[in-house]
From Swiss-Prot:
Residues 2-63 form the HTH asnC-type domain. It comes from the Archaea. DNA-binding protein that negatively regulates its own transcription. Interferes with RNA polymerase (RNAP) recruitment by inhibiting the association of RNAP with the TBP-TFB promoter complex. Homooctamer; tetramer of dimers. InterPro entries: ArsR-like_HTH (IPR011991), AsnC-type_HTH_dom (IPR000485), Dimeric_a/b-barrel (IPR011008), HTH-LrpA_regulator (IPR053456), HTH-Siroheme_Decarb (IPR050684), Tscrpt_reg_AsnC-like (IPR019888), Tscrpt_reg_AsnC/Lrp_C (IPR019887), Tscrpt_reg_HTH_AsnC-type_CS (IPR019885). This is HTH-type transcriptional regulator LrpA. The gene is lrpA. The keyword Lipid biosynthesis does not apply. Keywords: DNA-binding, Repressor, Transcription, Transcription regulation. One of its GO terms (molecular function) is sequence-specific DNA binding. Residues 21-40 bind DNA.
Amino acid sequence: MVDERDKIILDILSKDARTPFTEIAKILGISETAVRKRVKALEEKGIIEGYTIKINPKKLGYSLVTITGVDTRPEKLFEVAEKLKEFEFVRELYLSSGDHMIMAVIWAKDGEDLADIISNKIGKIDGVTKVCPAIILERLK
């Protein structure tokens, strides 16, 4: 299990994975070695699965980001999901129990690019029955 110190470490690293262990140690009032051991234990337990960065899609020329629901014929669900994983424009992919069977975060250069992605790429995958994009207006958190 994780204790309060571990939770604080996780909170700090989730906001900035590059936070120096010395800084975390000062916040917690423990040694850098203790922080290092705790982080290693969290990694070994699978609580920390990896480290990532936040990318600003607009700075790379992608003016549209969508959360897109994709529905499929039930027997094709996993095949469709595997195919979606192959597309570079699909930045995140989830199986869902909500309104749609699959949820994809998609980066598109503009409306024309998004239309092409929906109609000619996702919509043409065998088993896809519905594609429902929702354009993100602003990231709040």
